[in-house]
Amino acid sequence: MIEERFDAIVVGAGMAGNAAALTMAKQGMKVLQLERGEYPGSKNVQGAILYADMMEKLIPEFREEAPLERHLIEQRFWMMDDRSHVGMHYRSEDFNEQRPNRYTIIRAQFDKWFSSKVREAGAIVLCETTVTELAQDDRNRVVGVRTDRRDGEIHADVVVLAEGVNGLLGTRAGLRARPAPDNVALAVKEMHFLPRETIEARFNLKGDEGVVIEAAGTISRGMTGMGFIYANKECISLGIGCLVADFQRTGQTPYGLLDEFKRHPSVAPLIAGSEVKEYSAHLIPEGGYKSIPQLYGEGWVVVGDAAQLNNAVHREGSNLAMTSGRIAAEAIGLVKSRGEPMSATNLSIYKKMLDDSFVIKDLKKYKDLPPLMHTHSENFFLTYPQLISKAMQNFVRVDGTPKVEKEKASLKSFVKTRSWSGLVGDAYRFARAWR
């Protein structure tokens, strides 16, 4: 056993874990961070979106040092059927600001840099170290961790679980249940490399401008899921994900969906001639507010994806992860400054602080949307995209048919497929869940 005792042990070196370790180290706490990968980010080859406001609270000068790809000036949403898409997008020169609001990043590069800042702050970071279980005393209080290293048991006043959505430590220790299949999505992603000037021409970009495309519709074959495309400097991050429960129910494969997505007429021209160099699969928490587990206990707290903190409606995850990690660290620091033990009662302040933040407020607002989308997935991800595409094509095609007849034909198509009661019911349920 390692004799040295730590104020805190952080399990995981992703966004949430790094935020927690950095914040505690800056407070002067003795922090040990454990990561099973070869280096932080080694298991995160995919692209992602970084939200500047949350990063600034951790490292104000990050723009000067961090490996950033492009700042986002445009957001597109596509509702797709097999041959077309109906789009909505927002683009503004206001996002070409001195301190941009959002960036695309490559997680393998960014997480490695982020971890270097954790080390600079004074934390000890051990990679290639797997935490096998939580160490508990005879009163079931968490007092440290056990690892696969020779001197495997390490003690600390508190353990921060930042092990990701599929982390097993809390489950093995009986602290929380394993996420249900209908609360977790499996996403598959590829990195398509192209010359920088080709990417900028295809996406109408200049300099370091970036764009993100999010897509829903028949690409998920009636399952609850979405596709995405991020423009980076010299590559395009492309992927698709659906709920694990839906993959189990339908027998569809994520790889098959990804291949179909890449062949779609709206997507194929964007990646034509590209070279695929990286491929990954990743589990994402999708259950929202109702799936959040117990966030604290005797000697432990849980943050980020491990706490199911992901806004599936707005596709926000890294900002919730960083914020929860920072708030957990601040709560731990507050308990320590009072000279109090890391008991469940004292650590409950973490939940209070998180409840007062945008993290829980946003998740609570949309608490009914994830189950609604899952329960009525065939309507929202298959039927309506097909109906809307057909109606739009009818609307823009000029063939001598009077407009009033076109409108009646489109309405008749909706009513025939879903009925008046179905249409009204879907609209009511969606509006109620959105409010």
Swiss-Prot record:
Give UniProt keywords alphabetically: FAD, Flavoprotein, Nitrogen fixation, Oxidoreductase
The cross-references to Gene3D superfamilies, in alphabetical order and at most eight, read: FAD/NAD(P)-binding domain (3.50.50.60)
One Pfam entry for this protein is FAD_oxidored
Name the InterPro entries for this protein.
FAD/NAD-bd_sf (IPR036188), FixC-like (IPR039651)
Q: What biological processes does GO assign it?
A: nitrogen fixation
Q: Which GO terms describe its molecular function?
A: oxidoreductase activity
Signal peptide extent? none
Named cofactor requirement(s): FAD
Q: Which domain of life is it from?
A: Bacteria
> What does the record give as the function of this protein?
Could be required for the formation of a functional nitrogenase Fe protein. Probably accepts electrons from FixA/FixB and reduces a quinone.
Query: What's this protein's family per the entry?
Result: Belongs to the ETF-QO/FixC family.
What protein am I looking at? Protein FixC
Q: Which organism is it from?
A: Bradyrhizobium diazoefficiens (strain JCM 10833 / BCRC 13528 / IAM 13628 / NBRC 14792 / USDA 110)
Identify the gene encoding this protein.
fixC
